[in-house]
């Protein structure tokens, strides 16, 4: 009997699995045709009711999980037509019975599971009903006003609802998205939420977005549980104010009151609300939505007090999201950037998929208090996309899936890891294959590699999209298994199952599927995405009744793409499912929508599980988590039953644990270090406050977690903290970083958008920071050394890192992410890339062929071009070492695809200059022997060898026509051995031609070209340069025509010195009119200590301010001035006759463009400008220091700030190139026992100001226009009166305020002498005039005709030409003579212009004679004859009133008559006087011959009478003096100055100081 029973039980045991394998679920089918893909399905919680919306018009309802359907009537429109609805959504809180239909017509709502629907009513602020079907505000009926609707319900007040609508409208003729918010107290009638405020611009409407503070019944924000927060902002417009206003009200919306008032001046941008935390993001710049932002958290038990949260990284508006897990805030920051600066062009050909995956993502998680954040460092590499999957039931588990690249559509390269301790530690997802069924390309059993399950989509387990579905420890996912080389094809992925909450995974299906779970994971339904995954065209689904251990196939008779797979019970407790799919035609047109209801209620013959079928499952293998051990009851895997507790939430049991280290977090004043230890965080303000006036303090380094339930708390020992290391409370924030290597190079990306900077060290490592150096991270290159970094000057978000192994690391998002491409074979030569100005994907790379050794004669450079961003390279030209795209070099190239290159011949070593328009399939040699070429300011300048050891310069402005740079003829005596192109501005090139090349005695002539860049004149003759060709020449940024140079005062002595022992004596000169006039710099009256200088400042020749220039700079990027801090300059120098060594220098400053200077510090300092000059920072140079000096009031006062605990040697003080940020980076080093250590200190001055400056075009508010012109110009410079916009308030910062009118021309002026400079072959002499150089001739005036074919005339040279910058009109015309000549070949046009019509001329002349004769006749008869004729003519006296005047005509005639008599009298007297003087002349001559000793009585009396009388009529003409001077100096083409120059005046003048060694008195001036 015993054995018989055993056989019976064995038979039954073998039979039961057969029953499960033979089971087929009940399947119901339904089809809908002509849906055009518009099908929406919705199920209610804890209910069998399902809704279906077809074609946006027809609504159906099912009460049996979708087996049968009934039509539901919906409200009609006002004209009794069906309304169209776009979205069918379930209420987020009341999922059991409330749903909504929304569309362009408004919103419908149901409260009875879809049986009946009511149209919601919307009212404006004046209680007028809003009709959303009215499209008049859009202007195009094809574009609907409502784009999206978001509906919120209050978790404890069902009738309180908020609806936020995204509405399409028009703004300035463009379609604009606008947010409007409505509230309801009864759930049916909604009124517009409005603060009553208006935008500054009435044409720019306001956005409003409102939200309940209490998001769920679990919310811990108790004091705000019945409150609503609204955010109001203007609809964005270019350069507008992007900040918001925050309001708070209750659920009844009685009134809106300001919220978070302490943040209102800090530009609130976004609000993030979760169950435990309320965060507000504020912008550092209200005018820049991409500016760095700060995060603020509502303090515990407060309603309106916020504390700032430090994240350790930069965050940006609209690129940040906040979620919550187990009371901890998770912040994801998506750094996705495209070139949007004004000087960039978006890449229109860029793949949209590449753009989506082109950024990078950071993720951070807070402690349980939401205060201290740490990075979720799940991988060394930067992620370009990231999915964090967490469970709402077991919250400690996190799955991270990220991608680094997406190469093409359909190619996926992703990685995954799992954490069971909230991101503290991460591990790979282990793969199990106990039966060895699957082949993988890596070793899944090894713990030493990264071979694991790479998760793409996750299902079940209460994770992400299935967050309400709970299956204890049972999770399904789509993904692949690999270590390095993914298959890249989505359809080659598999479906995997885990039964231990993600610790291990097993493949169950060899294709990707949609997966849904029921009966708490005991039923798993999977539908392949591809119907042909099983090699037949029909669709099928697979199901498992043993938690994924085995699957059975169920074949369907249709072929479709599965769009939705829904459970009947939203909590995963049910046993039926709905599968929805779409049948497509071959051309991807939607033909039919199908739905299947799959019912498993009869599985296992309807058996329900008993206690013996259940098992205990412990989360995290029974480890204590948050003070508890979690235990769930779940069905045994092979049990032949279903739990069948439909609509019942599964619960778990908790067992409390004793407190351990895992239940504690770092205290508020501490942060966790790399070793996991809590260390004092000296950057926190709270620690600074506690340490104030104390030597040391004792604090507990840890605090117990807010979410733990552990018992028996540990005794935390306090730690003593020395306050010496804590900086004193200050508005300057300091962040220190230490490196064991030395920075060899560093450079910011030139942009307003970010403060991103790249570093390269002496260990060939590369680092990046996106917050001005506060957080510096190493760029992962796979261990490859970085040899060089190139920045793209045309696309300021792009940079390229050259790897030693010939990899090129490219970034197009300011260093947030890098893509790796391989460089062409051959040796890297270190030549910079050549970029295309209009195509970010196109650049030229230079590699070396046959260069095993650089001394190999066969070693030569080769230029390669890429047009796909480096993905592939083509050989462009052999021997080319420098190329330029014409579209990058000149403004208006005359050819397309033009490229010019310098090519070196391998055999002769000669360099040639070649061009091509077909990527060098054909080429043209333009010059066969050159030294090199460069581009500057729209010109290309080519240095061509000329004769023996001489050069000639050729220029082009279109890339086709080249002209020789014609230098002044008096320089012909000098060999043109070296010249330096100093740049171009406003249509003129500045160039330095070296006239003395002796070592340490170099100097030369400063030249300036005409607009064409072909004809040069000398500005100064002895301008200093060094042996490297650098010149002491600097144009002041942001101001017109101001240049500083250093001249060699003893140039003649140096040239004539035979032993070459003379030292250069340098003096600084400044010009305010682009080089036309130069003067020494007037020194300040006293030094920084209030003492007078030891020289007389009235004598500028002996006492002027001399500055160290470009030739002495350690970093050529350190300029005197800044383009954003208008008028400000710093310089090192001294007051005296000559420039002294830099060791004796002081630091000087000007804020008016160089007119007046002051000494700010003794000794030499480095300087930087911040926030357009709002912040000025100095740091000691050439000696150890721990202190910076700063000024926030334009240099009026200075304060010292100690930024380091010990003195360091400062290498550099840097900030963003545009000097617009308020963060400064100090780079230095200190020496310790381990050697030299690099240290960086980021000084943040953003808290130094209480607010951001206010500005608008109509009201300057915190700004003013100032004139920075030299006083002697009477505000007219370059022919106009210009003013500059500058901040006038010291308590605010500028940021990116839209200062588009920062330079404004108020009026044009008449031309004066200051608007002209000397023409070719003319030179300025000591009296300020332009004189033809002896022995030379003016330029042939006809040459201008050959350069401009549109001209028909030319003028004889006058010795003057108009300064290119001048916009003057009228006034003194010096450039053209009065006699024009026709251009050769343009005689006909010339005559046409100046021809005279003889017939017309004769007619006009006759008409004028007749008029004149008639007038004389009328005056004679009416005036002279009527009053007695000519007889009385001699009796008339001015002022007599005895003439006949009977009417107005008589009075007019007599007035003319009186004036005529007066004129005749004066002319007659003048003739008499002239005759008298002539007579006297002859009489004096005769008297000399006659030897008379005294005058005759006739002469004496007659002369005295006439002199006394005629003095009343004849004045002294001062112009006669000028005329005499012009005649005496007729060869000089002299024009007198407009103003006299007073050399004794304290005011520096524009009068020139000549340094011509040949002049006897070089400093004479008129």
Swiss-Prot record:
Ordered alphabetically, the record's keywords are: Glycoprotein, Golgi apparatus, Membrane, Protein transport, Receptor, Repeat, Signal, Transmembrane, Transmembrane helix, Transport
Q: Which GO terms describe its cellular component?
A: cytosol; Golgi apparatus; membrane
Residue ranges in the Cytoplasmic topological domain are: 1422-1566
In terms of SUPFAM superfamilies, this protein maps to: Oligoxyloglucan reducing end-specific cellobiohydrolase (SSF110296)
Indicate the secretion signal residues: 1-20
Question: Where do the BNR repeat units fall?
Answer: 60-70, 418-428, 496-507, 542-552, 767-776, 864-875, 1148-1158, 1190-1199
The record gives the membrane topology as:
Single-pass type I membrane protein
Q: Name one GO biological process term.
A: Golgi to endosome transport
Localization:
Golgi apparatus, trans-Golgi network membrane; Prevacuolar compartment membrane
Residue segments, region Disordered: 1534-1566
Coiled coil location: none
Question: Membrane-crossing residues?
Answer: 1401-1421
- Which stretches face the Lumenal side? 21-1400
InterPro entries listed in its UniProt record: Sortilin_C, Sortilin_N, VPS10, VPS10-sortilin, WD40/YVTN_repeat-like_dom_sf
User: Which Pfam families does the protein's record reference?
Assistant: Sortilin-Vps10, Sortilin_C
Give me the glycosylation sites of this protein. Answer: 796, 1308, 1397
Function according to Swiss-Prot or TrEMBL? Functions as a sorting receptor in the Golgi compartment required for the intracellular sorting and delivery of soluble vacuolar proteins, like carboxypeptidase Y (CPY) and proteinase A. Executes multiple rounds of sorting by cycling between the late Golgi and a prevacuolar endosome-like compartment.
The cross-references to PANTHER family, in alphabetical order and at most eight, read: SORTILIN RELATED (PTHR12106), SORTILIN-RELATED RECEPTOR (PTHR12106:SF27)
Name the family the entry cites.
Belongs to the VPS10-related sortilin family.
State what protein this is by name.
Vacuolar protein sorting/targeting protein 10
């Amino acid at each position: 009997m015993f054995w018989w029973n055993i056989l019976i039980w064995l038979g039954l045991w073998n039979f039961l699995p057969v029953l499960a394998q033979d089971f087929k679920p009940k399947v119901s089918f339904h089809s809908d045709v002509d849906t055009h893909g518009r099908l929406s399905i919705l199920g209610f919680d804890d209910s069998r009711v399902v809704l279906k919306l077809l074609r946006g018009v027809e609504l159906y309802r099912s009460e049996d999980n979708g087996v049968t359907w009934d039509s539901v009537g919906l409200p009609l429109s006002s004209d009794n037509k069906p309304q169209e609805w776009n979205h069918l959504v379930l209420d987020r809180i009341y999922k059991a019975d409330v749903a909504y239909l929304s569309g362009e017509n408004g919103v419908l709502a149901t409260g009875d599971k879809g049986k009946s629907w009511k149209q919601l009513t919307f009212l404006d602020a004046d209680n007028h009903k809003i009709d959303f079907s009215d499209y008049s505000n859009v202007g195009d009926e094809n574009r609907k006003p409502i784009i999206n609707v978001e509906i919120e319900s209050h978790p404890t007040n069902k009738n309180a609802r908020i609806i936020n609508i995204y509405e399409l409208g028009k703004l300035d003729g463009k379609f604009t998205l606008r947010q409007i918010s409505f509230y309801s107290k009864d759930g049916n009638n909604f009124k517009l939420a409005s603060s009553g405020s208006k935008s500054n611009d009435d044409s720019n409407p306001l956005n409003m977005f409102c939200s309940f503070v209490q998001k769920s019944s679990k919310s811990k924000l108790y004091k705000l549980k019945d409150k609503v927060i609204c955010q109001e902002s203007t609809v964005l417009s270019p350069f507008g104010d992007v900040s918001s206003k925050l309001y708070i009200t209750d659920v009844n919306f009685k009134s809106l009151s300001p919220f978070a008032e302490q943040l209102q001046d800090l530009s609130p941008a976004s609000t993030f609300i979760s169950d435990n935390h309320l965060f507000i993001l504020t912008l550092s710049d209200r005018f820049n939505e991409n500016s760095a932002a700060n995060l603020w958290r509502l303090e515990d038990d407060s309603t309106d007090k916020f504390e700032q949260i430090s994240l350790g990284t930069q965050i940006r508006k609209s690129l940040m999201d906040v979620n919550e897990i187990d009371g901890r805030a998770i912040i994801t920051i998506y750094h996705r950037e495209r070139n949007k600066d004004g000087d960039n062009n978006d890449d229109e050909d860029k793949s949209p998929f590449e753009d989506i995956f082109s950024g990078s993502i950071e993720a951070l998680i807070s402690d349980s208090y939401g205060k201290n954040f740490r990075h979720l460092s799940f991988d060394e590499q930067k992620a370009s996309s990231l999915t964090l999957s967490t469970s709402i039931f077991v919250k400690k588990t996190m799955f991270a899936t990220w991608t680094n690249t997406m190469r093409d559509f359909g190619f996926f390269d992703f990685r995954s890891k799992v954490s069971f301790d909230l991101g503290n530690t991460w591990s790979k997802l282990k793969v199990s294959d106990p039966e060895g069924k699957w082949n993988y390309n890596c070793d899944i059993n090894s713990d030493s590699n990264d071979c694991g399950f790479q998760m793409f989509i996750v299902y079940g387990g209460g994770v992400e999209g299935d967050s309400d579905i709970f299956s204890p420890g049972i999770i399904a996912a789509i993904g692949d298994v690999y270590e390095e080389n993914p298959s890249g094809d989505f359809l080659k992925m598999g479906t995997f199952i885990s039964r231990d909450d993600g610790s291990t995974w097993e493949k169950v299906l060899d294709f990707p599927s949609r997966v849904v779970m029921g009966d708490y994971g005991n039923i798993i339904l999977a539908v392949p995405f591809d119907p042909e995954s099983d090699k037949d065209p029909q669709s099928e689904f697979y199901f498992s009744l043993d938690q994924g251990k085995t699957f059975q196939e169920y074949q369907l008779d249709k072929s479709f793409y599965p769009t939705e797979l829904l459970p009947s019970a939203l909590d995963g407790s049910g046993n039926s499912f709905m599968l929805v799919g779409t049948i497509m035609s071959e051309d991807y047109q939607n033909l039919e929508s199908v739905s299947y209801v799959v019912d498993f209620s009869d599985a296992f013959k309807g058996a329900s599980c008993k206690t013996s079928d259940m098992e205990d499952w412990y989360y995290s293998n029974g480890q204590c988590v948050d003070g508890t051990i979690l235990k769930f009851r779940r069905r045994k895997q092979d049990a032949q039953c279903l739990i069948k507790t439909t609509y019942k939430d599964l619960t778990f049991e908790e067992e409390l644990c004793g407190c351990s280290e895992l239940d504690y977090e770092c205290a508020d004043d501490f942060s966790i270090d790399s070793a996991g230890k809590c260390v004092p965080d000296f950057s926190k303000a709270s620690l600074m406050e506690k340490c104030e006036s104390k030597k040391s303090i004792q604090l507990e380094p840890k605090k117990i977690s807010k979410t733990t339930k552990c018992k028996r708390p540990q005794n935390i020992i306090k730690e003593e903290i020395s306050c010496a290391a804590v900086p004193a409370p200050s508005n300057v924030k300091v962040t220190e970083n230490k490196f064991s290597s030395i920075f060899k190079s560093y450079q910011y990306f030139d942009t307003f958008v970010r403060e991103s900077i790249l570093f390269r060290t002496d260990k060939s490592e590369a680092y990046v920071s996106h917050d001005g150096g506060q957080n510096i991270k190493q760029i992962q290159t796979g261990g490859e050394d970085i040899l060089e970094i190139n920045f793209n000057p045309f696309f300021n978000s792009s940079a390229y890192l050259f790897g030693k192994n010939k990899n090129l690391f490219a970034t197009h998002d300011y260093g947030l992410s890098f893509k790796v491409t391989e460089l062409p074979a051959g040796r890297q030569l270190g030549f910079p890339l050549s970029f295309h100005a209009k195509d970010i994907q196109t650049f030229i790379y230079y590699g070396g062929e046959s260069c095993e050794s650089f001394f190999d004669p066969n070693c030569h450079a080769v230029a390669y071009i890429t047009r796909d961003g480096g993905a592939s390279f083509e050989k462009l030209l052999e021997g080319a070492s420098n190329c330029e795209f014409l579209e990058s070099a000149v403004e208006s190239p005359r050819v397309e695809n033009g490229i010019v290159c310098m090519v070196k011949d391998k055999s002769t070593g000669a360099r040639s200059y070649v061009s091509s328009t077909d990527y060098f399939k054909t080429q043209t040699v333009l010059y066969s022997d050159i030294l090199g070429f460069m581009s500057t300011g729209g010109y290309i300048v080519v240095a061509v060898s000329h004769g023996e050891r001489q050069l000639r310069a050729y220029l082009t402005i279109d890339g086709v026509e080249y002209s020789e740079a014609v230098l002044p003829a008096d320089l012909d005596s000098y060999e043109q051995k070296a010249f330096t192109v100093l740049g171009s501005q406003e249509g003129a090139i500045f160039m330095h031609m070296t006239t003395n090349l002796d070592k340490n005695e170099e100097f030369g002539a400063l030249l300036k070209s005409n607009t064409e860049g072909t004809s040069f004149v000398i500005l100064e003759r002895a301008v200093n340069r060094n042996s490297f060709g650098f010149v002491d020449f600097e144009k002041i940024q942001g101001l017109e025509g101001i240049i500083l140079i250093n001249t060699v005062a003893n140039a003649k002595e140096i040239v004539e010195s035979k032993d070459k022992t003379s030292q250069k004596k340098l003096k600084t000169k400044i010009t305010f009119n682009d080089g036309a006039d130069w003067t020494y710099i007037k020194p300040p009256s006293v030094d920084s200590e209030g003492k007078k200088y030891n020289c007389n400042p009235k004598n500028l020749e002996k006492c002027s301010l001399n500055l160290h220039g470009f030739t002495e700079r350690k970093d050529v990027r350190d300029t005197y001035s800044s383009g954003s801090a208008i008028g400000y300059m710093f310089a090192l120098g001294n007051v005296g006759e000559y420039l002294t060594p830099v060791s004796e220098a002081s630091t000087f400053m000007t804020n008016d463009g160089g007119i007046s200077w002051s000494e700010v510090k003794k000794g030499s300092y480095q300087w930087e400008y911040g926030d357009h000059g709002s912040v000025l920072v100095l740091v000691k140079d050439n000696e150890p220091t721990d202190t910076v000096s700063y000024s926030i009031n334009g240099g009026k006062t200075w304060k010292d700030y100690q930024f380091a605990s010990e003195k360091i040697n400062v290498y550099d003080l840097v900030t963003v190139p545009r000097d617009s940020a308020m963060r400064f980076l100090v780079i230095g080093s200190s020496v310790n026992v381990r050697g030299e250590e690099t240290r960086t200190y980021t000084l943040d001055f953003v808290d130094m100001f209480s607010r951001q400056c206010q500005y608008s075009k109509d009201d300057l508010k915190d700004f003013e226009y100032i004139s920075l012109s030299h006083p002697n110009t009477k505000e007219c410079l370059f022919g106009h009166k210009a003013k500059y916009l500058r901040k006038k308030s010291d308590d605010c910062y500028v940021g990116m305020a839209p200062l588009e009118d920062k330079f404004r021309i108020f009026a044009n002026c008449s031309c004066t002498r200051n608007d002209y400079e000397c023409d070719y072959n003319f030179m300025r002499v000591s009296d300020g005039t332009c004189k033809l150089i002896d022995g030379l001739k003016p330029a042939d005036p006809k040459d201008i005709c050959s350069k401009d074919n549109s001209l028909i005339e030319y003028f004889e040279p006058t010795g003057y030409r108009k300064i290119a910058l001048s916009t003057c009109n009228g006034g003194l015309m010096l450039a053209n003579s009065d006699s024009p000549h026709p251009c050769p070949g343009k005689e006909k046009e010339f005559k046409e212009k100046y021809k005279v019509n003889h017939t017309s001329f004769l007619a006009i002349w006759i008409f004028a004679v007749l008029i004149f004769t008639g007038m004389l006749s009328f005056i004679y008869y009416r005036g002279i004859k009527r009053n007695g004729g000519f007889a009385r003519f001699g009796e008339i006296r001015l002022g007599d009133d005895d003439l006949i005047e009977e009417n107005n005509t008589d009075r007019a005639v007599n007035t003319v008559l009186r004036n005529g008599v007066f004129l005749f009298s004066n002319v007659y007297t003048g003739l008499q006087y002239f005759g008298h003087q002539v007579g006297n002349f002859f009489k004096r001559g005769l008297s000399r011959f006659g030897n008379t000793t005294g005058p005759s009585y006739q002469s004496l009396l007659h002369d005295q009478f006439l002199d006394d009388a005629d003095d009343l009529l004849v004045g002294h003409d001062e112009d006669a003096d000028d005329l005499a001077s012009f005649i005496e100096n007729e060869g000089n083409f002299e024009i007198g100055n407009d103003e006299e120059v007073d050399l004794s005046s304290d005011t520096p003048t524009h009068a020139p100081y000549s340094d011509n060694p040949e002049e006897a008195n070089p400093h004479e001036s008129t």
